[in-house]
């Protein structure tokens, strides 16, 4: 640990001088895991290696975030004043989370393929089996428990990765160093990375976690896609988020309906969320639809003006005639 006063507490010295290198420790551990996997170890050994390495990485990162959250007021560490680069916000650290996530996700698929789909069942069902003391049953229950731990780890990795990328973005905003890196990172995070971290959780029966992450981070496009998912979405969830977030969620939801040609569904919200729908039409270029809303609400002058305005945009006579019908 280098030179230090032998009378000084070793743990205190570590946190004082070496905690900044935790990111390097995680990077080293990641490299070791990659080497072991590439050596061709069997599925049980691979499971043990990945589960244990994930435990260490998550223990370090989640503890760091929880500590900072609990002490942020005391140390004045709010998101608007991040001008320092924490070890979690370093580019070398955040780049580890994507392969960590994919490695863990792949392990779930590999185990299901090699060990059989029964490992994805609830182990409690087998614990009530008369053959509970059977060696094969005990092994299956053990593997089912491992599978559930891996699923939970995947959820935690998604959470910590999103937090770390948010940290990096806030640091770049506060430092005013690299505008190009900030723009590129925000685009990658919002359009590619964050969806790829949250959506797969639905496939492993962790849809509640997916909803919670999207809600917590106000990822309204992802929330919309989850709410309109035939398997996990519901009208109750949609109404909940419309009431909670108003225009922020509503605009993204209504935009999704327009993009996907679900206009009948869109106009179903007129009665309960008419004002929200009107705000959406007023702030978006959807005159071809907004006049229908105006007619439904009795705003005939607005409907007439909108139709005239829309027809003036047409360059051919036939579309004008159709638009004015």
Feature locations, PLM:
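Non-catalytic protein-protein interaction scaffold segments in large eukaryotic complex-forming proteins
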Residues: 1-85
